[in-house]
Amino acid sequence: MDRTPGAAGPARVDATGWGWRHAGRRRPAVQDLDLRIHAGERVLLLGPSGSGKSTLLHALAGVLGGDDEGEHHGRLLLDGRSPADARGRAGLVLQDPDSQVILARVGDDVAFGCENLGIPREETWRRVRDAIDAVGLDLPLSHPTSRLSGGQKQRLALAGALAMRPGLLLLDEPTANLDPRGVAEVREAVARVLDRTGATLVVVEHRVNVWLDLVDRVVVLGADGRLLADGPPSVVLDERGEALAAAGVWVPGVPLDV
C-alpha cells in the first residue's frame, strides 16, 4: 500500500435504502439499495442494461448532478460523507478512451485532475510521475496523447485518476472498446495499481472473465434497479448463474434467454 505523505487510504461505501430517479423518468434507475463495501474490497458490479450500474458509479463519484438532474432517496455515503462532499476520494474511469483525453501531452493530461483539486505544482508532478509508472505507461511526459493506442489512452485515464490519490477506484466498462491487447494492458495496469495503493475497487464490466481473479465479491443489480445478488464470485456466478442469466445478466458459460 502507498505510504507516501498525503496518500489516501482505501475508502468505504455505505448505502441505506438509496435510490435515484433521473429527471423526466418514471422509474428509478436504482432503488432501495442496501450495500456496504468495506475499505479495500474489490467488487465486480453486474446487471442487465439499464439496471443502474453506471448511475451508481456516477453517484459514488459525486457527479450525478443537483436537484434539476434528478432526485434521490435514502443515504449514500463515502467514508461517512456525501460523495459530493468527499471531493477527490473517488476516481472514475469511463469506457470511451477518446472522450477522456483532455490535453495534448501525456504529463499535462495526468496532471489535470490534481490541478483542479488545487494540489501544489511540485506535489502534482511528483504524483504524475508516480501514476504513470504505476500503470506501466513508459512514455515521456511530453509524448503526444494523439499518438496513443486505445489501451494506452485507458491507462492514461487510469493514471489521471490515480494521481488524485483516490481511496475508491470506479471503472465503468473500461475495456468495452478495446482490442484483446488493450484489454490485457488495462487489466494488468489495474492489478498493479491495486497492489500498490490498496484502494477499494468497483468495476462494471461485461467481460466478466477479465476480472474474476482480481475481485473478491460480485454484486448484481436487477433490471428494476434493485439488489439481486451479492457474495463471493463462486457463489454468485456458479450457484446462481442460470437465475441471473434469466434476469438478463451475462454470466460466463450460461446462455442468455432471448
Can you describe what each PLM-predicted range is?
Residues E205-H206:
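H-loop/switch region of ABC-family ATPase nucleotide-binding domains
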Residues R165:
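Conserved catalytic motifs of ABC-family nucleotide-binding domains
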Residues E122-P140:
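Conserved ABC ATPase "signature" region
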Residues A161-L162:
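ABC ATPase C-loop
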Residues P144-L148, Q152:
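Conserved ABC ATPase signature
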Residues D224-V249:
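Conserved beta-strand-loop-alpha-helix hinge in the C-terminal portion
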Residues L169-D172:
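Catalytic Walker B motif of ABC-type/P-loop ATPase nucleotide-binding domains
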Residues A61:
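Helix-to-loop junction immediately C-terminal to a conserved catalytic motif
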